[in-house]
Every structure is written in structure tokens, then in C-alpha cells.
Amino acid sequence: MRCQHCHQNEATIRLNMQINSVHKQMVLCETCYNELTRKPSMSMGPQSFGFPFEQAFQPKEQSAAKQSEKKGLLDELAQNITNGAKAGLIDPVIGRDDEVARVIEILNRRNKNNPVLIGEPGVGKTAIAEGLALKIAEGDVPNKLKNKELYLLDVASLVANTGIRGQFEERMKQLITELKERKNVILFIDEIHLLVGAGSAEGSMDAGNILKPALARGELQVIGATTLKEYRQIEKDAALERRFQPVMVQEPSIEQAILILQGIKDKYEAYHGVTFSDEAIKACVTLSSRYIQDRHLPDKAIDLLDEAGSKANLLIDELNDEDAAERLTAIEAEKTKALEEENYELAAKLRDEELALEKKLNSSSAHTAVTVEAEHIQEIVEQKTGIPVGKLQADEQTKMKELEAKLHERVIGQEAAVQKVAKAVRRSRAGLKSKNRPVGSFLFVGPTGVGKTELSKTLADELFGTKDAIIRLDMSEYMEKHAVSKIIGSPPGYVGHEEAGQLTEKVRRNPYSIVLLDEIEKAHPDVQHMFLQIMEDGRLTDSQGRTVSFKDTVIIMTSNAGAGEKQTKVGFQSDDSVIEEQTLIDSLSMFFKPEFLNRFDSIIEFRSLEKEHLVKIVSLLLGELEETLAERGISLNVTDEAKEKIAELGYHPSFGARPLRRTIQEWVEDEMTDLLLDNGEITSFHVILEDDKIKVRAK
């Protein structure tokens, strides 16, 4: 019989033991018996006597195997990305060949071979490290990197449970020693700026300082990834910075982002059980690029893809085939048992359940996958941003053709102004404007009450689907020099620096808006200086250092400056429009600087309204009143004579159309109010002209 401890020599000693009230017997060779009885625990009394023999029951081969299975510190704190790449757990990396090649070049160096990936959040820095792991797994790397393994270090786990002084340094030293021994390991540290200051407390060394000597000599290799803003923390420590070689990661173009999504869509289709059409892939990129301004491609496009797949997956009444098959087997057994027991009622119920389950299983197998289309992506963008993307995308070409007619319906008597605005917007939508300039920048000049603000509201409704898409700033709030800072936020060191600017933050959140600055001549001249850059380059930097794009906004400023001045023309001149425009610019030059006026796409003069225009405006105002009454189930009928009388009563050459609203309130709405209070069961109102006076009749 062989020895139960070494399994090699013949057993010569039979040993009987009782350990913790359990009787055990084993056979040993003389060598193993002498080895076990010499252990110090043998002299520590009967309870500890059995301890070495308890271990003796385990074969030496097994204990050696356990030693080999024991993982090092690196395996506890880091994850092997290369193994994940070999197992197919990593998404394919597309369009980043140049960056991956640059990383491989740096890793191939003799010293300071530590690349750090720097770029904005969401541009794909971690994906480049995963791309390197895929290339290593495929063997598509130089000979020096053939057998390398890429480990992702968890910095939080590195610092955890190191509360006692010296524990962190000891753990770092152990990690560095292990990395020096395992020459085939490349350490990837995401958010590498966390190394600066990690683990330091009251004079102890931080992770960055501990790693410096090993990084400089090339004893271990590290790949880092961080954002531009957070890389400054590493730049403060010049000695640490020089040990890293920066690799800039730029945001991919729209074409590259589409290729990236087409490459990874198979993974998302398999996960969600849906299919993505090519139009949906394109919509993910184009819509996220256009409407989600504060994030970067391809991350924001992948988020849309994932969310659309998730939403479509929830609509599928999915049946698990394995569970259904197991239940069918169980039903068959239960049905057989019920028949044996002559329980025919239960057997009939089980038969019905079996038929229903088979039918559902067959329909599930024949079920075609749900396809995600571009419309689904539009719905998600609308939910995330609040921008009516569907309205903006639908029949845009037709909408642009009809823009001028739609504006004329609401803005009366300003044909030239409406025509100029419509032309500028159509030119922009056709892609003929400068890439970064706003859609249009206009200065509306004219007397009060002629439709300057109304044109802005109508334009917002036609362009962006809602009249609420207006960011309106009252220039009377910006008459003082110090108030100008409210537009972009207070500078550092001043109260309110943490708060966002009134204009920049609104445009950042709602880039598709009309910015309306009423009575611009009231504002301090510094406001004009601030808008010089917006109208020229379509961008403005707020007090937090964030650049806000105005390329999707329409800038409209209104002014009464010079509206009351008329110049007499002397002599003969065929082109009156040239003289009028020159006269207008000359009068505005008294209030605004030439460089400010020169940046507008168009300076539009609004004419004073004539009596015939006021009748149309009365019809519009009464139409609004009719809609209000319709909500209460009351109809309204107004004769043409009554409309003309209202226009006559409300006409004032200096005040424009605003007196009309007051006239309607005085002659129509007040009469209706009295009638409603006297008789609550009114179904219709008739406004007529009787004895040259406006009368309201109720039915």
C-alpha cells in the first residue's frame, strides 16, 4: 500500500487519530511520519497535534497546484483585457488605426515608452487601448509586443484598505516588483490623472512619485488615458509628465462615426434582439452631431443606438425557448401521471396549456426581428433635448419654399422685410452660408408696433416648430457696464462665477433658437462688442471656459434708432432703394459703430402701417379671440364693416398696430364680458356695426 502523503513510498506505519471528535486513520511511510512529527505544532498539546496530519491527508501534488493557482496582486487589482479580446468580449475598434499605430510606436521604444491618450470625453480613448488588445490577440503587432498582456488597473482598489501609514507604499512597491518580474505585462490606467495625489497623506508618497523611477528606466510599461482638462494635473508635475508621451485623440468626423457604428451594430443587434437600418445608423450620427451639442462623437451616437435598441426590445413579447421546452417536458410528465390516476379534468387543463405554449413557441420562432428606423432615433433625440426634431426634419424643402408665404400670413404690411428674412434663411438651409456663422443675423429698424417682434415669433414657429424657441433678452437690463457679465457669467473671483451666463447657458442647452435682443440701442456698448464675435464666427466663450456655438441660432436685434428721421431728396435719382438704405445706415451710425453694423446679414427697415394693413391685423387679432372662445364652446362672427370700424378707431400713425388690441378690448371684449356675466348659457357672439357704432349680440 502506498503512503497517503507522498503517494510514492510503501506505507509501513498505520496511524489512528481523533481530531475534533472525528476518528481518522491514515497509512504513512517512515520518511513522511518523521517529517510530520518533527513539526513544532506537535509539542503544543493534543488539540494542535492533529493539525499537521490534517494537512497530510492532502496530496503533495494538490497543495503544489494550489500554490500555482494563487494569484498575485496584479490579478487582484487589474483585469486582463487581452484575455477578453481573445474571448471575443471586446467590441471591434474601427477608424483608429493611426492612433493605435502611434501607441505601438511608443511602446516599441527603449525608454519612456509610456503613451498617454488625451482627448475630450467620449471620443474613444479607452477604445484605442482595447484596439491594441485586439491587435495583440490577433498577433498583428511587432515581435517585442507579441506575447504581451494588457491589464486594466483599478486605481480605487489600489488605494482601498490602506488606512495605516506605509500600507499604500508597501502595496505599490509590491505591484512594481510584480510588474518588473512579469515583463510581458502592459498596465493600462484609465483616468491616469488619479495617480497624482493617490494614497498621499501627511507626508507619505503618492502613486505618481513612487512610479517615476520605474517609468523613466523602462522597467514597466504604462498606457494612460485622460481628458485635456484633467491632464493639466499631470502637467503640474513636470517630472512625471516627461515620462509620458502624449497621443492626441480627436473627435471622429461624421463619416468616420458612421463607419464606427456600422462596425459595432452587430453586437447591439445581438444584445437587444433587433436590427438597425442603415438610415437609423446615419440618423444616430447626424442627429446627435446636430442636436446634442455638449457631448462628442462617437459616444453620443452610440448612446442613441443603444437607447433605440433598448426601447425597441421592450416592445418585443419575447419567449425564452429553453424555459418553454422545459415546461413542455414537465407538462407531458404531469399529463401522463394525471391519466394514470384517471384525473381527466387536470389532464384536459394540461393539454390546453401545452397547445397554447406550442402555439406561442411557434409564433415566437417565426417572429421577425424589430427594425429600428430613423424615426425612432428622432423620437429619442426629442426626448433627450426637447427639440422637435420630427417637425424640423419633415418636408424641410417644402417648408423652405413656403416660408415667405407663411410669414406673410402673420406679418402684415412688411413685404420687403419678410422677403429679406426668408431669403437669408433659405440661403442658410441650402448650405450656402459660412459653416460657423449663425443661420442669420438681422437688425430690425422701424417705429413701434409695426411687427418687428411678431416677425421673430413667427420665424421661430416656422423654423423650430414652436414660438417658445426664442431666447429673449431685454436690453434695459444691460444698461450698466457691470451688467454685461450676466450674458456670459461673472469672471473668476466675483460673486456668481459658478452660475452660468444668461445667454450662453440657454444657447448651450437649446442651440436651435432665435436670440431676440429688444431695443438694442438701450444696452451698454460692451454688449455690442460681445456680439461682434457671435455674428462673425458663431461662437462665444463663457466665464467657465466653455465655447458655445451659435451656428444654429438666428440673431435678431430690434431698434427704434433713427426711425423718426427722414431726409429730403434733392434732384433726380432713379434708384430710390439705394438712397433709402444709405440714409438708414447714416442715421444708425449715430447710435452704432460701423464694425457692428457691418456684421449683420441684413439691416431691415420696417415701414409704418397703413389703414388697409390694419384691417388684416384686426382679422388676426379677432382670430386669436375666436380660438379662446372656441375652447368654451362659443362661436364668434364679425362683419367686415365692424372690422373696418375697429381698424379706424385703433389707427394712429405713430403707434402702429398696438392700439388695435386696446380697441378690441374696449369695444368687443368688455361687451362680451358683461353678456357672459348676465347670461352664462351663450353659444355664439355676433359683432356688427350699427349706427356707426360697434355692437355685440349674443345668442
Curated annotation (Swiss-Prot):
This is ATP-dependent Clp protease ATP-binding subunit ClpE. ATP binds at residues 119-126, 446-453. Belongs to the ClpA/ClpB family. ClpE subfamily. Interacts with ClpP. It comes from Bacillus subtilis (strain 168). ATPase essential both for efficient CtsR-dependent gene derepression during heat stress and for rerepression. Together with ClpP, degrades the global regulator CtsR after heat shock. Is also involved in disaggregation of heat-denatured proteins. Has thus a role in overall protein quality control in response to heat stress. InterPro entries: AAA+_ATPase (IPR003593), ATPase_AAA_core (IPR003959), Clp_ATPase_C (IPR019489), ClpA/B (IPR001270), ClpA/B_CS1 (IPR018368), ClpA/B_CS2 (IPR028299), ClpA/ClpB_AAA_lid (IPR041546), ClpA_ClpB (IPR050130). SUPFAM superfamilies: P-loop containing nucleoside triphosphate hydrolases (SSF52540). A zinc finger (C4-type) spans 3-32. PROSITE patterns: CLPAB_1, CLPAB_2, UVR. It comes from the Bacteria. ClpE is a very short-lived protein, that is, at least in the soluble cell fraction, degraded mainly by ClpCP. SMART domains: AAA (SM00382), ClpB_D2-small (SM01086). Disruption phenotype: Cells lacking this gene display a retardation of CtsR-dependent gene induction as well as a delayed restoration of the repressed stage. They also show a significant delay in disaggregation of heat-generated insoluble protein aggregates. Signal peptide: none annotated. Keywords: ATP-binding, Chaperone, Metal-binding, Nucleotide-binding, Stress response, Zinc, Zinc-finger. Residues 325-360 form the UVR domain. Induction: By heat shock via the relief of repression carried out by the transcriptional regulator CtsR. GO terms for molecular function: ATP binding; ATP hydrolysis activity; zinc ion binding. Pfam families: AAA, AAA_2, AAA_lid_9, ClpB_D2-small.
